[in-house]
Amino acid sequence: MKEFDTIAAISTAIGNSGISIIRVSGKEALSIVDKVFKGKSKKGIIEMNTYTMRYGNIVELSNGDIIDEVIVSFMKGPKSFTGENVVEVNCHGGMYPTKRVLEEIIRAGARLAEPGEFTKRAFLNGRLDLSQAEAVMDIINSKTELSMKSAVAQSEGVISREINKLRQRILEIIAHIEATVDYPEDDLEEVTAENVSKDLNDILKEIDELILSADEGKILREGLNTVIIGKPNVGKSSLLNLLLDEKRAIVTDIPGTTRDVIEEYINISGIPIKIVDTAGIRETEDVIEKMGVERSKEKMENADLIIFMIDSSKKIDAEDLEIIDYIKDKKYIVLLNKVDLKNREDKSKLDLLNKDNIIEFSVKEKVGLEKLKDTIENMFATGNLQHSNTMITNTRHKEALLRAREHCTTSLKALQDTLAIDLASIDIRNAWTALGEITGETLQEDLIDKIFKDFCLGK
């Protein structure tokens, strides 16, 4: 276990609540908290047994005045989250009492922790690897049961085990190549280009399977980026309110009411969906509305799914056709809204689009709502998304896998072109290094620091 100073931070969300928790971690955690803790039983906490609690008060270091009534728990390292001695102080919730307890612990000798520093120490002390550490934040940020289950599986080491198996197989290839090259006179089993190529192809298949899972995994982690588009007053904001089951967006008969994008999360069959209501797309001289239209177009560029709304009580015009031409090669659903009114649109103008993705809809009468949800589920909720724990959800992991794949492919080409196994071994080792970046074993320290700085304070 590495030696660090003792850190402290608030681990619960700031705000009024029944309880707040201040976490203290480090070699001196017990002795520091003992300076400001007065137990009801008149006992200090220096001799506390691990996994026990004490009831008492946190007092001012200077004069002994009571700050708050607390319960203190102790977990002795290395059998704690960080691998160090950890003390958690449970005080009354609320910004001021929590802040005062933390201030007094810092006065007693602790340092205010940096964002993610507790989890970083757990990683550096070998309590978890980097992919497991990242899963901690994924659990906190999960939006649905499916996304939480995926994050929990990663925190339990599902991805780590797959990566470690691949790295071990690559390491065995490297060891056999180096033994053959360095000790040709020894009576070793011959390693040929054909043998190595076969092993690498098997490894490539497994890497490809993990890469293929990444698109669905990204949806679980970050949400399905869904953009509602259409001309002004076709019902985009009304659709957002219907999906959220609340009045989140302002709805009026005045075109151009929505001038900026509105983003909210909804849950459809376990799929977290980040749904974006955009400004109506039309030619306008209004400067603010014009900016909103430009943002709408930017959101369309990065969307996983586009929901295009058409007012079916009006004829399809040039602006609609322009959007149809844009979305035809993307993932889309077309809602023919206002079917409760007289239908005037010419459906022949929709021939460029997949008829299975066109839904007759009425926000007002809730016609087509279930079909919309079913269509989204059929498009994105595959068997893997519903049942597979071994899924790549992190873009950083996908990029490392792509690098490993590239190195394996390059080494295979070298074997085919030259049959020289020693030349191929350089790229094979680079593939091993790339995979190690996922678990943190071969990642540079500055990149590790950057990852943990994105964590919340107190975690």
UniProtKB/Swiss-Prot annotation:
Q: Identify which cofactors the protein needs according to its UniProt entry.
A: K(+)
- Name the residues that bind K(+): 233, 252, 254, 257
Q: Which GO terms describe its biological process?
A: tRNA methylation; tRNA wobble uridine modification
Query: Mainly localized where?
Result: cytoplasm
The residues that hold Mg(2+) are 237, 258
Q: What would be an example GO MF term here? A: GTP binding
Protein known as? tRNA modification GTPase MnmE
